[in-house]
Amino acid sequence: MAITIDIDTARPYQVYVGTILLEQAGPLVRATAGGTKAVIVTDTNVGPLYQMPVKQSLEASGYEVSICTFEAGEAHKRAETYVAILEFVAEHELSRSDVIVALGGGVVGDVAGFVAATYMRGCKFVQIPTSLLAMVDSSVGGKTAIDLAAGKNLAGAFWQPSVVIADVGCLATLTPEQFADGCGEVVKHAVIADPELFTELEKTPLTLELLNQDVARVALIIARNIDIKRAVVVADERESNQRKLLNFGHSAGHAVEACEHFELGHGNCVSIGMGIITRAAALHGICDAELPGRIEELCARHGLKTSCELSADAVFAEALHDKKRAGDTIDLVIPHGIGRCSIDRTPLSTFHDLIAEGLGQKGDASAC
């Protein structure tokens, strides 16, 4: 039995979290998106594992189904991939009432969603996330994007799906490293909005072992994370204010991701970003003194990094491409305690120093 979460955005939809949901994709898509044709967009890792049950379910529900596959990895979240999928969709003569189905992790969802947002100025879109990170974060909220040479997620659109189908059984095929990477967003949600969840994770970390022992409990944790994001997104769908809280750890984290040439997972980079900002906040007396240690320990128990060997100058240089930059300032999420964060417009020179302090390096605003 699936857990259902209502997302009451301008175009409302539901998220289903449970097991054996891939086989129910057809009826769920039919009931929410309609149309007669469906293109499944997937990658070379996920497609061989899960495309057939989804395709068969869609066909059983009356869809004419085509599959578009691209190379897996953040390196392929590029304009070339985006255009290739657009051409595929056009060649298969999808109309605006037909549906694009994203089957995969965050990269697949981001690219397929951007295609759906822009093909014929918008067609139906369904998210079927198969990674933990995509289930708890990127599949919900309507953000779609591709990367540019200058930085991550610099071209994109807000485009809400018709439905999100999160089959927790898909997580069993993740490596421990992939599963741990998704926990970066889980820890982030707990820090910004849910002290009780943070304490529960301290007692019992979210791991593949827990998935094998108690899949229902993992489904509940995933649903809880989705509900945290739901509350923020519904209050601020277009990220004009409070939705920026979801960017905790992301300004520095995205910069680390770029410095590492996207070879380090997004969740790990976010946890490094959280560590950087929290340690710097503690040095300035902005947050509870014990906060850095608690976050670092929880991240470590989930197999996540909270620091790196990069120079502050290198991280700062990449952070200058961040979408949250406004002239000589940037909007940073500053933690004060578990469940207590604020959005602060911070001078870039101060941001450079915070990065340096968070990395244990001497602040030097001359790089600004």
Residue ranges of predicted features:
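ATP/NTP phosphate-donor binding region
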Residues: 1-99
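Generic secondary-structure signature for well-ordered alpha-helical cores
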Residues: 91, 160-163, 169-176, 184-196, ...
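Short glycine/serine/threonine-rich phosphate/pyrophosphate-binding segments
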Residues: 107-114, 135-136, 255
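C-terminal charged capping/lid subdomain of soluble metabolic enzymes
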Residues: 184-187, 286-368
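Active-site segments that bind and position negatively charged phosphate/pyrophosphate groups
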Residues: 204-314
